[in-house]
């Protein structure tokens, strides 16, 4: 990979981290600003594919307003770049930590994330976003029995 191509994954990771930092402070607009107008979106709370920034914003407002995450850990970050260098797929695992009532940090949700970015008018934008739980509680509970 050339030095120029190395800058693209760094730029995408920087955008993703900045959006997630805002999310952790209860501001989901960082992600909304990164989405294209016709973004497609899934997460564990969606019953169907959400299409369009407006639909995603309504979903965020309903389920994620006021999120408060103390910190996040990014694991297994991987960016695949198209030959044309205008399309990239970012995949990673995210561990979130919150502060409990005793002011102790504890692990919260663990996520799988896949984001499809496209370079549009000189700016990397998210075309598709898919979030899932890393280890779904129902599946983990069945295995523990």
What do these predicted ranges mean?
Residues 2-33, 40-145:
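A beta-strand edge to alpha-helix "cap/lid" segment located at domain peripheries
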């Amino acid at each position: 990979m050339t030095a120029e191509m190395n800058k693209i994954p760094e730029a995408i990771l920087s955008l993703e981290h900045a959006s997630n930092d805002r999310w952790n402070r209860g501001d989901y607009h960082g992600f909304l600003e990164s989405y294209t107008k016709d973004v497609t979106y899934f997460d564990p709370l969606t019953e169907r594919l959400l299409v369009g920034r407006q639909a995603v914003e309504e979903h965020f407002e309903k389920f994620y307003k006021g999120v408060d995450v103390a910190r996040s850990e990014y694991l297994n970050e991987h960016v695949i770049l198209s030959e044309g260098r205008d399309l990239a797929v970012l995949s990673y695992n995210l561990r979130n930590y919150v502060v409990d009532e005793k002011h102790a940090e504890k692990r919260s949700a663990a996520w799988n994330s896949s984001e499809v970015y496209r370079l549009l008018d000189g700016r990397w934008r998210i075309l598709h976003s898919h979030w899932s739980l890393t280890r779904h509680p129902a599946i983990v509970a069945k295995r523990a029995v």
